[in-house]
C-alpha cells in the first residue's frame, strides 16, 4: 500500500502567527494529520485566547513571541529539538492612514517581512537537517494596489520576492520554500470588511466564485506544499483567491 503523502505523524511543525485566523487553521490542519504543532502568538499564554473567535489552541504548543522585535525572535526558545515545517502566518495591518507615517509603516514591515527573514534564518539549520519546508502566507495584496495600506502591500510583495529568493538560495540545502497568497478570508484581520454588509457585497462582486475563502482551504494548500506531492516545487507562491486576480 502506498503511504499517505499527507500523513504528518512524527513531523515537527512551527506556525508563526498560529494563534488565530489562517495560521490557526493551518496549525490544526497539520495536527489533524498527526504532526506535533507549536504556535507563536502575541498574548502571554494560550489561556488568553479562550472563547476568542477564530482561535483554538487545543492540542497545540504555545509561546508568546513578539515577532516585530528582532530581540524577541533571537531569544525565543526553539519548540522542538529539530524542525520539519516552518509556516509564516504572522501579519499586521494598520488603518486610518497610519501606514503612511514612518512609525506605522515600519511596524507593519517588521512583522510582515523582516520577521520572515529572521525566523527563517533562525531555523535554517534545523530545517536543512530534516529536509524541511518553509511556507510563507502572504496575500493577493502583493500583486495589486491596496489603497490605504502601503506598508501591507509592500511587505506582502516583499514576502513573495523573499519566497523566490530563498527558494533558489536554499534549494541545494534540501529546504523547499513556497508560499500562499490568499484573498479575503473571514478572520480577525479582515473584520473591517466582513463586519460591513456594503463592503462584503462589494468585495464578493469582484470574486468570480462569489464567496470568500476559508481557513480550512488555506490549510489544505499548506498541507500540499509541505508534502511529497509538492516535492519539485520551489520558490512558488500559489494564489488562492477564488479568481479575484484573474
PLM region spans:
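Conserved glycine-rich cofactor-binding loop
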Residues: 19-20
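Substrate-binding pocket helix/loop in short-chain dehydrogenase/reductase
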Residues: 96-109, 203
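Active-site loop-to-helix junction immediately N-terminal to the catalytic Tyr of the SDR YXXXK motif
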Residues: 145-153, 165
Amino acid at each position: 500500500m502506498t503511504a499517505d503523502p499527507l500523513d504528518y505523524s512524527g513531523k515537527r511543525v512551527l506556525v508563526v502567527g498560529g494563534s488565530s485566523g489562517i495560521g490557526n487553521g493551518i496549525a490544526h490542519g497539520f495536527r489533524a494529520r498527526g504532526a506535533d504543532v507549536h504556535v507563536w502568538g502575541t498574548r502571554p499564554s494560550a489561556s488568553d485566547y479562550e472563547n476568542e473567535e477564530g482561535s483554538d489552541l487545543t492540542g497545540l504548543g504555545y509561546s508568546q513571541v513578539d515577532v516585530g522585535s528582532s530581540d524577541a525572535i533571537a531569544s525565543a526558545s526553539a519548540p522542538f529539538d529539530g524542525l520539519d515545517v516552518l509556516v509564516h502566518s504572522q501579519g499586521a495591518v494598520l488603518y486610518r492612514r497610519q501606514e503612511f507615517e514612518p512609525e506605522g509603516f515600519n511596524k507593519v514591515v517588521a512583522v510582515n517581512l523582516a520577521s520572515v527573514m529572521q525566523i527563517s534564518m533562525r531555523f535554517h539549520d534545523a530545517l536543512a537537517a530534516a529536509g524541511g519546508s518553509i511556507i510563507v502566507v502572504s496575500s493577493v495584496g502583493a500583486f495589486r494596489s491596496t489603497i490605504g495600506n502601503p506598508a501591507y502591500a509592500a511587505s506582502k510583495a516583499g514576502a513573495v520576492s523573499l519566497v523566490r529568493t530563498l527558494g533558489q538560495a536554499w534549494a541545494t540545502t534540501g529546504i523547499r520554500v513556497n508560499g500562499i497568497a490568499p484573498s479575503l478570508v473571514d478572520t480577525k484581520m479582515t473584520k473591517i470588511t466582513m463586519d460591513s454588509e456594503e463592503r462584503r457585497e462589494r468585495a464578493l462582486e469582484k470574486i468570480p466564485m462569489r464567496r470568500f475563502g476559508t481557513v480550512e482551504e488555506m490549510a489544505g494548500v499548506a498541507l500540499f506544499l509541505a508534502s511529497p506531492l509538492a516535492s519539485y516545487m520551489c520558490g512558488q507562491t500559489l494564489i488562492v483567491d477564488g479568481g479575484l486576480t484573474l
